[in-house]
């Protein structure tokens, strides 16, 4: 996966496979991370937001968005870091 795959999805809702039903996560940001030349592709970070009533534990989720996916992504909860909207925030770091 690369940053270029996710930039068009910013602002869209992705579905994370959960029980009893998929959780809706909005992709609010996709940004590059400092490239130290240690990986075959530039590192990047994705930030997702869920509704206040949805709280995911850190782990691996199968995610989809329209024609994109399924892809397996590790998510972990993070601080809101200035986001004003209510809800929980999660990050996926690709390095």
Task: Annotate each PLM feature.
Residues 1-95:
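Surface-exposed, beta-sheet-biased, low-hydrophobicity segments with strongly acidic/polar composition
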